[in-house]
Amino acid sequence: MNLWIKRALLALGALLLLAALAAMYFIATFDATHYKSVAIDWMKTERQRTLAIDGPVDLSVLPRLAVKVSKLRLSERGRADEFASIDEAALSLQWLPLLRNQLVVDSVSARGVRALITRDAQGQRNIDDLLGAKSDAAPGKTSGPAMRFEVGSVRIEDSSLALRDEQAQITGTVMMDSFTSGRLASGQETPLQFRTTVTLERPQVLRLTFDGKTALTFDAANGSATLRDATVKVGGDSEAVKSLHATLAGNLAWDGSTLTAGPIDVNLSDAKTAALTLGPSTLIAQRLVYSPS
């Protein structure tokens, strides 16, 4: 073997050994209480919010970076009212892809996530401070190539998002009973399954449940996405329609500016209005097109 190759391999081995030793030292000396305090102080100083971490923080760095937290609560800005809480969340990602400007997340899981999004009549939202200031950079210009990312799997259970929008006069809650996905990466098709409940108080009272599955493909570069072989069971009640039970099936595509659907099959099992009782029926739409612009 060439002498320089041997030296390069020895140097690489030494670097890997040093990295492993450094990781072992970091784990051995990791003080969760200290990092909790740092996060709590930063949130209080920079965002004027109170962060509470009542559960343990687990960390591992080899063979991948993995973090697990539980019992988190975050207050509204400048107030003690709860903005969000998490019963349990975990994330793990790979180290080496970061060197190639790639973010490869092995898995993301969360249970018991609760959040409240509000917007007042003037358009101010309670998340504006968390989103940060708008960039002054010219549109279309970036400091470098965008980081590529992929996620091996996502699992969310027993989570909800409450919405109070005074500007749009909407009050409601989206309850995510379960959501699972396969590998999420630009240009790759992945299966999705979900069970969710949407409840509205304004502009009208309704409660709808959705139980569905589909195959998602998205393109991060142009913002397009397709849903293939989507099947969604819908049930619920509203002020106008009671005892709704239906199944929707079909394909959807968004190219960044236009939504195209079709063919779409709507199979109604039953539904009731003030004047009618509807029995089993079917509606087929070969193609639907909607352009917001």
Region locations from a protein language model:
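N-terminal type II signal-anchor transmembrane helix
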Residues: 1-48
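Secondary-structure transition motifs
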Residues: 49-50, 66, 70-187, 239-247, ...
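Short edge beta-strands and adjacent turn/loop segments
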Residues: 54-65
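Transmembrane beta-strands of outer-membrane beta-barrel pores
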Residues: 112, 200, 268-272
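Transmembrane beta-barrel architecture of outer membranes
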Residues: 191, 205-211, 243-249, 285
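Contiguous, well-ordered beta-strand patches that form the walls/edges
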Residues: 194-221
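Short, structured motif recognition centered on aromatic/hydrophobic residues
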Residues: 225-227, 261
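Extracellular/lumenal glycan-associated surfaces
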Residues: 230-233, 264-266
